Design a protein with these regions (language model features):
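Extracellular adhesion/carbohydrate-binding repeat motifs centered on closely spaced tryptophans
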Residues: 1-85
């Protein structure tokens, strides 16, 4: 089979979203930058290029909620895991 790289994917229940970085590793525990080439598994390009995301301790992405960015400003995390611009 093929390893997921640079991909947004859901768990088996379809409730938690994950990002597998270009090295095939799930992001975890904090802020990270999307590569700009990420794909949604089975759907093709996500339509969002780059930007920031936040991964929880279980590797799931923070979605549809407000967080504090590294500089302390409040930001909204969209349903696809990207920080709203």
């Amino acid at each position: 089979g093929y390893m997921y790289v640079d991909t947004l994917t859901y768990d088996k229940t379809g409730t938690k979203l994950y990002y597998v970085n270009p090295y095939g590793v799930l992001e975890r525990n904090g802020w990270f930058q999307f590569s700009g080439h990420e794909f949604e598994a089975g759907l093709g390009f996500s339509g969002k290029a780059g930007g920031y995301g936040y991964a929880n301790s279980d590797c799931s992405l923070s979605v549809n909620e407000t967080r504090r960015f590294t500089d302390g400003t409040k930001v909204y995390m969209q349903g696809d895991g990207h920080m709203a611009q």
